[in-house]
Structure formats: C-alpha cells, structure tokens
Regions:
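Short beta-strand elements
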Residues: 18-24, 281, 385-388
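Walker B catalytic acidic pair
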Residues: 298, 304-305, 316
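Catalytic P-loop NTPase motifs of RecA-like helicase/translocase cores
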Residues: 111, 303-310, 353
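Peripheral, non-AAA+ core regions of ATP-driven protein-machinery
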Residues: 1-216, 220-226, 329, 469, ...
Length: 509
C-alpha cells in the first residue's frame, strides 16, 4: 500500500515543498526513512510509532518505507513527524480522506501530542505560495501562523483531534489572519528624555537614525554610551509590515520568537557580550541558525566595548554590514541570512578608560592607548559612518530638574527626513541614505560648489578613503533632509566632516 501527503521543508531561511511518501510491503517488520534525513528526522521513527499506538491506532506489522522528496536536500529537525504519521495511517487504511490540498508539519510527543517547531511562519508562507489551501500546524505556533492570509491555518493539539477533524467527526476552527497595525512604542522602551546632557551625541544619533547610518561612540566609563545606544530604537521609524514580516521570519527560524507573539513590530535591539563567538555573532552551527547580526535585522546591533571582541568576530562583520546579508558556507550547503542593521559601537579610549579625560588621569603605560585602539581595524572603522565623542557629563547637567527632549519629538523629525528619502529614492529599492551605492550617492548627494571645496580640503587634510568620502556625502544628505533642504550645503558638509574627526584625533596621532 502506498500513500503520500504534503509538508514544507526549511533550509536556512529558504523554504520548499516536501512530499512525504509511505509504502508498506511484505517482509520482516522494520521502519526505514530515506530522503537525506538528519538524526532528528531519523529519530522520528520511534516518536511516530509510539504516537500511533498511544492514539489508539495500530502501527503496521510489515516493512514500512518513508521517503522525503526531494531526496537531494538534507531534511533537518522534527517537523516531519506529523506528515509521516498521516502518510502511514493513510497507507494502512486507518485514515481515509482527501489530503491533496493540505500540508502538515509538527513534532510529536510519545503520547500523541503535537509539539511546536521552529520556522512555522516562513513554512506557512511557502505552503500558500505552493498553492495549498490548508496547512495543519502545532497549536503552540498559532500566533505566527495567524499572520499569513490566503490559506486556512489549523492549529493542532493532538493526533486524535486532528484525525477526528479529517474524518469530519469534529471540527478544528482555522485561525483568523489578523490585520497589521503599526504599534505605538511600548511604554517600557527607554526614552531619550532620561538622558541628561550629551546634546552633541543626541544630535549625532538623530542624524544616524534618520539616515540609517552606522555609529561609533568613544568616551570614558559612565559617560552614557550604553544609555544612549539603548534609546536608539525609540527614535527609529516604525516598522512597515514587510519589515515586521522579515524580522519575524528570522526569529521564527531561530526559535527566538516570544510566546504568543505573531509579529515583531518594535525594531530589535541586540547587544551581544564581547565574549560572543564568531559563530554566535554571524550565525552557523551544526544546524545553521541566524546569529546576532541577523537577529538585529531592521533594528540595532550594539557592540559595547568593541576592542574587547575577538578580531575574528569584528572582521566577520565588515562585508555583511555593507551588503545587508551574511553568507555562511558549509561543505554541504551555503546559507544566507538577511542582516540590514544599524551598527552601533561603543568603546573606551584606553584600557583604564580615562585617556583624554578632562579631570581624571590616565593610568595606562605609554603606548597602551594606541595599542588598545588599534584593535579596531581601519577597514572596520571606515565602514562606520559617524564617529562621536561622548564626554563625561558635568554636575550642573546631571543635577538639573529640566526634562530633556523626549524620543517622540526626535522620532517625528526622523520620520519626516525618512519620508523625503523614500520619495527621492522611489523605484530604487532603497529606503534610506546609508544604503545608497556610489552611483546613487553621486546622483542625489551633489554638494554646492562651496560645500565641495570644504569637502576637498577635509579629504586631503584627513587622508580620507574613497569609502569615507561617500559616507560623508551620505551623512551630509541626511543632515540636509533633517533641515528640509534640497541641496547639500556648507553647514551640512561641515557637520558631516565633524563626525569623522575620530579618524584624526585617536587613530592617526
């Protein structure tokens, strides 16, 4: 006897339809699985056998062969437990129903309960794309399954409940796809109103948020670098539905989606510790999973104490932060994960932290500050659009009772600047100034003659690279957008050059 049912496979971030085929033949009882299953898939034999028996059904006393097609792609994880069980029951005649337009996925417990799995959102999207009219998913994954419209999504708690539904003895209600609404910022999101002083740093971060620029903050301990960084998500533009969907897919694949959350609507803020491994930062592992840089997609990746990160971890980010994706090459396959992030780095100017402090004396031996700062390579520094000094806050600023400008007011200006960018970049597939390539930079960031002269003098004096030249133009364009100006003029270029001053002050002295 032969039967087959549909499922969906997950390969990195890519999904594909899978046909689960079951064949019963004469011979000594055994249960074989073919189609490049990994260990977790092979182990499903025992889970399926026990789930069938504990659901009051009979496991066939014959030779059972299950094939997962296509057979040239390795199958990973326990997501095929449920479709394998359905295929076997159909092959034995214990389940008689039409499942041709249906897809199944889910892990089984030995008792017959259906457990949640990773990656349900992209797999439901693939099922819709493949033309399936129904998909049966674990009840635990109900929230993310509800995001997709155009396909009936049925949440399943147990094998018994699913079989009763398929036999039309009982009904499982499909989940209702919810409409996307932009969310207001959660009340517990840190606000810039809490930050005393640091007006120059706040202005630089406003420019960075408006244009999606990468930032380096350098200053002594306690000056507020981490405090400022944690408040950046509160001034970034609200996520669009497409951005929320992309981000949620990554969290779904990584198994990091919070319980009962259907969509991630607030921009991620990821702050890995400096002891993170290169694989933890970039992604990978035996079963490849997205790393911190991908989990920060459409949000902020904050690297505090940058020189303390391993050289490999730092250098691994150079290409991804420019390309907006990271590629992990393995012998068996190559995986790509999106990572369009706003990279924010912070560091002390020396090991003790007080090099250049106005009142505290640096206790490092001669040459230590330069050696410490040289841990950050020039090519990585070159990819950071904005460098800002965060000096210590004086007593008068700390003790004032006046409230600082709230994040909502800053976000309003950022939104207006982004709207100008979107209108200017319409049709290019780019959403902010920082993502422009060299050709678009020349087209949209042309300075006035006086501004061009200023930029030329700075280029020669600071010994800037071609990449730094383009970044100054893009930052100047963002400053002009914040001012509502059509042309990039002298004040805009002057402020943008100011944000490259760390090249000269610390790294080149």
């Amino acid at each position: 006897m032969f039967a087959s049912v549909n499922s969906v496979g997950l390969f990195g971030m890519e999904t594909y339809p899978v046909r689960v085929e079951a064949d019963l033949s004469a011979g000594l009882p055994r249960f074989d699985m073919v189609g490049l299953p990994d260990a977790a898939v092979s182990e499903s034999r025992e889970r399926v056998r026990a789930a069938i028996r504990n659901s009051g059904l009979d496991f066939p006393v014959s030779r059972v062969t299950v094939n997962l097609a296509p057979a040239d792609i390795r199958k990973e994880g326990p997501i095929y437990d449920l479709p394998v069980l359905i295929a076997i029951l159909k092959a034995t005649g214990q389940l008689k129903c039409d499942t041709e337009g249906c897809a199944f996925l889910g892990e089984l417990s030995l008792s017959g309960r259906v457990r949640g799995v990773h990656g349900v959102l992209p797999m439901v999207m693939e099922a819709k794309k493949s033309g399936f009219r129904e998909i049966y998913i674990p009840y635990e994954n109900l929230a993310e399954g509800a995001v997709v419209k155009g396909i009936d999504v049925y949440p399943v708690k147990t094998v018994d409940a699913l079989l009763r539904h398929l036999r039309k003895e009982e009904t499982i209600a499909p989940v209702s796809a919810s409409d996307y609404t932009e969310t207001t910022l959660p009340p517990d999101l840190p606000d810039f109103a809490d930050v005393k002083g640091q007006q120059e740093a706040k202005r630089a971060l406003e420019v960075a948020a408006a244009g999606g620029h990468n930032v380096m903050m350098i200053g002594p301990p306690g000056s507020g670098k981490s405090m400022l960084a944690k408040r950046i998500p509160s001034i970034l533009p609200d996520m669009t539905f497409e951005e929320a969907l992309e981000t949620t897919k990554i969290y779904s694949v990584a198994g990091a989606l919070p319980k009962n959350v259907s969509l991630i609507k607030v921009r991620p803020f990821r702050a890995p510790h400096h002891t993170v491994s290169p694989a933890g930062l970039s992604g990978g592992g035996t079963v490849p999973r997205p790393g911190e840089i991908s989990l920060a997609h459409n949000g902020v990746l904050f690297l505090d104490e940058l020189p303390e990160f391993s050289r490999t971890a730092m250098e691994i980010m150079r290409q991804p932060i420019e390309d907006g994706k990271i590629t992990i090459a393995r012998v068996a396959a190559t995986f790509s994960y999106p990572c369009s992030v706003m990279l924010v780095c912070a560091m002390n100017p020396c090991p003790c932290g007080f090099y250049g402090h106005p009142t505290r004396k640096c206790t490092c031996p001669p040459g230590a500050p330069q050696r410490y700062l040289s841990r950050v390579s020039g090519p990585l520094l070159d990819r950071l659009d904005i460098h800002i000094e965060v000096p210590p806050v004086d007593f008068d600023e700390l003790s004032t009772s006046e409230k600082a400008e709230p994040s909502a007011a800053i976000q309003a200006r950022v939104n207006r600047a982004r709207e100008r960018q979107l209108a200017r970049l319409k049709g290019t597939g780019i959403t902010c100034n920082a993502k422009m390539d060299a050709a678009l930079t020349r087209e949209f960031c042309t300075p006035t003659p006086a501004a061009a002269t200023l930029l030329k003098n700075a280029f020669e004096k600071l010994g800037l690279s071609a990449r730094a030249y383009d970044k100054i133009l893009r930052v100047a364009r963002t400053i002009a957008d914040l001012d509502g100006a059509e042309q990039v003029d002298v004040p805009h270029v002057a402020e943008a050059i100011q944000y490259r001053s760390l090249d000269r002050k610390f790294w080149l002295e």
